[in-house]
Amino acid sequence: MANMSVQLVAVERRLWSGEATAVVAQTTEGEIGILSGHEPVLGQLVEGGVVKITTPEKETVTAAVHGGFLSVTADGVSVLAESAELADEIDVAQAREDVKRGDEQARARALSRLRAAGHSS
């Protein structure tokens, strides 16, 4: 499978950058899977979504993303999130607490963080 260049960037920092074989993200139009050679597209990311990047070594980089855009060009894929966290950085206990006591937007973010960290609730 051919590789493509992928950037995962949030307003506050670059979370991940490198070669990948696939990217899956949730947009306002539905879930989209991107492979090398995909047609150019610009999609709006959903609030409280999860992005999964598959590396050439078959490792999966997972992140909780909150708003932003996904851009696919001939040069690669850019995920530009308003905010994002890598799955291995998520405090699962805190996210569960946020689900219990948060308002609707805080709950959506917390649920996204739990999904990215591999916990359904």
UniProtKB/Swiss-Prot annotation:
Belongs to the ATPase epsilon chain family. The lineage of its organism: Bacteria, Bacillati, Actinomycetota, Actinomycetes, Pseudonocardiales. F-type ATPases have 2 components, CF(1) - the catalytic core - and CF(0) - the membrane proton channel. CF(1) has five subunits: alpha(3), beta(3), gamma(1), delta(1), epsilon(1). CF(0) has three main subunits: a, b and c. Keywords: ATP synthesis, Cell membrane, CF(1), Hydrogen ion transport, Ion transport, Membrane, Transport. One of its GO terms (cellular component) is plasma membrane. It is found in: Cell membrane. InterPro entries: ATP_synth_F1_dsu/esu (IPR001469), ATP_synth_F1_dsu/esu_N (IPR020546), ATPsynth_dsu/esu_N (IPR036771). It holds the Pfam family ATP-synt_DE_N. This is ATP synthase epsilon chain. CDD domains: F1-ATPase_delta. It comes from Saccharopolyspora erythraea (strain ATCC 11635 / DSM 40517 / JCM 4748 / NBRC 13426 / NCIMB 8594 / NRRL 2338). It is a peripheral membrane protein. Coiled coil: none annotated. GO terms for molecular function: ATP binding; proton-transporting ATP synthase activity, rotational mechanism. Produces ATP from ADP in the presence of a proton gradient across the membrane. The keyword Amino-acid biosynthesis does not apply. It comes from the Bacteria.
